[in-house]
A protein has these predicted regions:
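Active-site gating loops and adjacent loop-to-helix segments of metal-dependent hydrolytic enzymes
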Residues: 90-92, 116-125, 193-215
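Histidine-rich, glycine-flanked metal-binding segment
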Residues: 2-5, 10-58
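Divalent metal-dependent hydrolysis catalytic cores, especially in the metallo-beta-lactamase
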Residues: 82-105, 119-134, 149-164, 183-187, ...
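Extended substrate/RNA-proximal surfaces in nucleic-acid metabolism proteins
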Residues: 139-157, 176
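Active-site-adjacent beta->alpha loops and helix N-cap segments on the catalytic face
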Residues: 105-112, 164-175
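Short amphipathic alpha-helices and their capping/turn segments at secondary-structure boundaries
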Residues: 41-52, 84, 142-145, 172-189
């Protein structure tokens, strides 16, 4: 695998800024050297990048994206191709998108559809959170299957959007119990959808439909 040595830059890490050179082999950061140590040790590389005056940072991970998401008769404007290309230009090297499953739909088919959308179309690495619309016996089984066989480690549940994604407290509890057994993480869209729908209807009845009332 090709080796790349990034020299003379300022490395930004969780511990601060460091005058450090970075040796990369393939897609792995192989070593960090204090300034000048790489030369002293006669470290060789296929390509040397002079990053003088620049910051060197790890690739960002965007853990909440919505590529090609259909919702409410509209769709997210970014495709996996355009969205991940923009991400790469901004220094993001991994996204975690939301694979979609609504009431009455099969969880496996929802994940497979998102793989079809993303496969071969991404400029960066990608993974998926799995949205589950309405918890039932089958989706509880599917959660564990996806953890054990499909590499899914997190599930998105909703307290909003009745009839589309909504799960009640009992359903959410059962999903959390299942996640405690299979090691997954539960993420919550924690808005009270039932109350919101009442408020929306009241606003509409009063004619309060300007964007400012959305807040």
């Amino acid at each position: 695998m090709a080796r790349i040595l990034i020299k003379n830059g300022t490395v930004v890490s969780p511990t601060g800024r460091h005058e450090t050179d970075v040796l990369i082999e393939g897609e792995t950061i192989l070593a960090l050297f204090e300034r000048g140590k790489a030369d002293a040790l006669n470290v060789t590389a296929d390509k040397v990048i002079d990053a003088k005056g620049k910051y060197v940072v790890p690739g960002g991970i965007d853990v909440h994206t919505h590529m090609e998401l259909p919702f409410g008769g509209t769709s997210a404007s970014d495709t996996f191709e355009t969205g991940t290309t923009a991400a790469a230009w901004g220094g993001v090297t991994t996204i975690v998108d939301m694979a979609l499953q609504r009431y009455g739909e099969n969880v496996h088919e929802g994940l497979a559809e998102w793989h079809r959308k993303a496969g071969g179309n991404c400029a960066v690495d990608y993974a998926f959170h799995q949205i589950i619309g309405g918890i039932d016996e089958q989706s509880l089984k599917d959660m564990t299957y996806l953890v054990e066989h499909e590499g899914v480690t997190s599930f998105k549940l909703f307290m909003a959007y009745p009839g589309v994604f909504y799960s009640d407290d009992g359903q959410i509890l059962r999903a959390m119990q299942t996640a405690s057994e299979n090691g997954a993480t539960i993420m919550m869209h924690a808005e009270n959808g039932i109350a919101i729908d009442v408020l929306v209807q009241q606003r509409i009845a009063r004619g309060d439909t300007d964007p400012k009332y959305h807040s």
